[in-house]
């Protein structure tokens, strides 16, 4: 009898909450598009990455650290944590690092959600909030956006004694909308003490300063009765998506709890070195923000000229009402070597989401969009 019998199927007892989860749909990679469609020189404006690359200082620092890869990383990420504390104006004990800020989301759910716990999220927003809760066996309470903004009053009305976490991405992904600081302060002051409010600020770097709430100072001064968490990432403005490094700012008591569910060495050595260097590369950071603002302004004007309506955004991406089937437009754009995001899966069947690119990418996108709109008779 052969040692292995290929035709015997595994009989797995998969928990229902796991069986019902749909894997996260990442943006289509460039090499996959070029393999499937037989094209070259394609561009990707779908995943809100930094089109100007990574910080040169980060690249240099990583190159100089390649000889130390046989060593485990510093499990405390001391120097990166120290730099973040100085940057954010909080104590080192009020910071936790993650393999991307999404890992900090996972820490929070692992630490505070049980079978009967409830977590409030908005729809649409980052899909992983709900997935982590579902894996843990908690209950998702999903509140639809109101006029493409978080519906704070309905969220408040949904809070009960079982509510443990509230996730609010500010600015919101995929709409790019934000919450006025005064509204957010009132919301925080209305929350009970048993709730932790998680403000996902992945795109906060791109916001106008007068529209930004200084969440780190709220955390430092223990404002409100509820726990407050700010999630940040090096994936967007700092251009380090491939390194997977983010962090959370929160009260020391919450950090202590999250360390209990954190894997050792969760942020690798190169990510620590690269993020530390990127944090100090102010020139690259400021140039990224400037170029993003310039590109956003140009695209908004040109897209309106095509007869479409772009949606105002405080991020590095924006929505466009294409006045037709977004999935069809997405497919047609692929044939022209341009990857964008259809928003039909988010409940917006006539919208696409586009990342601001370089000047060359923006012009190529606009030409492809113009051609596709005409070919599909959308305008």
Curated annotation (Swiss-Prot):
Its cofactor is pyridoxal 5'-phosphate. Signal peptide: none annotated. It catalyses: L-histidinol phosphate + 2-oxoglutarate = 3-(imidazol-4-yl)-2-oxopropyl phosphate + L-glutamate. The modification N6-(pyridoxal phosphate)lysine is found at residue 236. Belongs to the class-II pyridoxal-phosphate-dependent aminotransferase family. Histidinol-phosphate aminotransferase subfamily. PROSITE patterns: AA_TRANSFER_CLASS_2 (PS00599). This is Histidinol-phosphate aminotransferase. Pathway: Amino-acid biosynthesis; L-histidine biosynthesis; L-histidine from 5-phospho-alpha-D-ribose 1-diphosphate: step 7/9. SUPFAM superfamilies: PLP-dependent transferases. The keyword Transferase applies. It comes from Desulfotalea psychrophila (strain LSv54 / DSM 12343).
């Amino acid at each position: 009898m052969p040692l292995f019998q290929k035709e015997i199927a595994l009989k797995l007892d998969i928990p229902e909450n796991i069986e019902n989860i749909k894997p996260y749909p990442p943006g289509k990679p460039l090499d996959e598009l070029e393999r499937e469609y037989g094209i070259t020189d394609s561009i990707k404006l779908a995943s809100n990455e930094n089109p100007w690359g990574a910080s040169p200082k980060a690249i240099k620092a990583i190159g100089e650290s390649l000889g130390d890869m046989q060593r485990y990383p510093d499990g405390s990420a001391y120097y990166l944590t120290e730099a973040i504390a100085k940057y954010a104006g909080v104590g080192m004990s009020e910071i936790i690092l993650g393999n991307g800020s999404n890992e900090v989301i996972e820490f929070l759910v692992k630490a505070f959600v049980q079978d009967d716990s409830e977590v409030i999220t908005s729809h649409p927003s980052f899909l992983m909030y709900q997935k982590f809760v579902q894996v843990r066996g908690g209950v998702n309470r999903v509140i639809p956006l109101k006029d493409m903004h978080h519906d704070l009053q309905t969220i408040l009305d949904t809070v009960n004694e079982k509510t443990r976490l509230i996730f609010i991405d500010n600015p919101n992904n995929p709409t790019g909308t934000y919450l006025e600081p005064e509204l957010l302060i009132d919301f925080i002051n209305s929350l009970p003490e048993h709730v932790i409010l998680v403000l996902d600020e992945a795109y906060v770097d791109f916001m106008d300063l007068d529209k930004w709430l200084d969440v780190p100072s709220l955390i430092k001064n223990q404002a409100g009765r509820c726990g407050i968490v700010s999630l940040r990432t090096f994936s967007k403005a700092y251009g380090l998506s491939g390194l997977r490094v983010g962090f959370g700012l929160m009260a020391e008591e919450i950090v202590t709890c999250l360390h209990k569910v954190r894997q050792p060495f969760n942020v690798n050595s190169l990510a620590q070195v690269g993020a530390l260097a990127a944090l100090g590369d102010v020139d690259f950071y400021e140039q990224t923000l400037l170029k993003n603002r310039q590109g956003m302004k140009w695209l908004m004007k040109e897209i309106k000229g095509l007869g479409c309506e772009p949606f105002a955004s405080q991020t590095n991406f924006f929505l466009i009402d294409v006045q037709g089937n977004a999935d069809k437009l997405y497919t047609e754009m692929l044939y022209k070597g341009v990857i964008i995001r259809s928003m039909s899966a988010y409940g917006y069947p006539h919208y696409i989401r586009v990342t601001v690119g370089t000047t060359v990418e923006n012009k190529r996108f606009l030409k492809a969009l113009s051609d596709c709109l005409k070919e599909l008779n959308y305008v």
